[in-house]
Amino acid sequence: MENKFARTVLGDIPVEKLGITDCHDHFIKNGGPEVEEHIDFLMLNVDASIKEFKEFIDRGGSTIVTMDPPNVGRDVLKTLEIANAVKNLGGNVIMSTGFHKAKFYDKYSSWLAVVPTEEIVKMCVAEIEEGMDEYNYNGPVVKRSKAKAGIIKAGTGYGAIDRLELKALEVAARTSILTGCPILVHTQLGTMALEVAKHLIGFGANPDKIQISHLNKNPDKYYYEKVIKETGVTLCFDGPDRVKYYPDSLLAENIKYLVDKGLQKHITLSLDAGRILYQRNYGLTKGKQTFGLAYLFDRFLPLLKQVGVSKEAIFDILVNNPKRVLAFDEKRNFDPLKVSKEVLELKKELNLN
C-alpha cells in the first residue's frame, strides 16, 4: 500500500510523522466500570494530561495511542483538547473504538450482548470512517465527532476467553478487514495471548496489524517467543514502572532475549499509565511525587541499553514497529467462508451466532 498513513484524532498523517510512539496509554478516563474497581481510574484533568504529554515530547516522544473504548472511560472532546494543545509541538493522538474485557459489560443486556455482530461491526466501522460518537454509544442518540478512531480494541479476561470476548474479537477482526484499521487486545495479566492471536487470524485479520498487550505481566520469554513465531503478531510491552508485578530488569532482559532471537520487529513499548498515580502531573494534583510518561526515557531506555539491547533494536521498537503496525492496511471484504474451522467450532460450542 503506497502512501501509508495512521489515523489520528486530528486527521490522517503519513506514518513517518508518528516518530517515537507509546502504543498503549491513557490521558482521560471519564468513568465507567474501571472506576468501580479503583477511584484512581477516574482521570478528568485536561491540564495535567497536557503537561504530561509535553514532558513526553520534551524527551523526544511524538505519538500516544489512547486505548479507552466507548463506555470504558473514552472522552472524545477532552482528548481533542489535549491533541490540539500539543499538535504544534509534534504531538499526535490516536484513539480507539471497540471493547474491553467481558467483565465490564452486562452479559444479558449490554449492546455487546444483544446487538447482532454484523450491526456492531457497522457501528465500529462508522467510528473509524465517519467519526467517533461523542456519547460513546451510551444510548439511542449518536453525535459523530470530526475525530475518527485509529485503532480497534478488544479484551479478554484472566485465563479464559468469555463468549462475549470472542464476539468482540470477531468484531475487531471484521472491522479491521473492512477498514484496514489496526487492532490492539487487552489480555488480563498476559494470559490467553496465543489463543487471542489465533482467533483474530482465524476470522481473517492480518497479523501484521495486531498488537497483544500486557504480556509483561506474564513474564515468560519462551511464551513470548512462541506467540510471535506461531502467529506473527506484535507484542506491546506496556509495563515499565510496575514493580508490584516484576522489576524493570526482568522486562528488559526478556526484551533482550527476543531481540537476540531476531524478533525485534515484533515488539512495541508503552507505559499504560491509566491511573492517577501512574502519571507525574496527575500525582502532583493529589500531593504526591510519582513517575509518569517520562519514565520510559529517564529510566527504562537506559536500562535496555545497559542489558545490551542495541540502539538499532530500540529504534525499531519505538519508531519502526509502531510505524508498521499502526499504518492502515488495504481494505478487504470479509468472507465468512474463509473463517477457520477452529473458530467456527468454538463459536458453535459457545452458542454464538
Swiss-Prot record:
Its Enzyme Commission number? 3.1.1.104, 3.1.1.25
Q: Which GO terms describe its biological process?
A: catabolic process
> Which residues of this UniProt protein bind Zn(2+) 1?
H24, H26, K153, D272
Question: What cofactor does this protein call for?
Answer: Zn(2+)
Class of this enzyme: hydrolase
Keywords assigned: Hydrolase, Metal-binding, Zinc
InterPro entries xref list: Metal_Hydrolase (IPR032466), PhFuoseLconase (IPR054957), Phosphotriesterase (IPR001559)
Q: What is the effect of changing H100N?
A: 4- and 5-fold decrease of the catalytic efficiency and affinity for D-xylono-1,4-lactone-5-phosphate, respectively
Q: Which GO terms describe its molecular function?
A: 1,4-lactonase activity; zinc ion binding
Q: What is this protein called?
A: Phospho-furanose lactonase
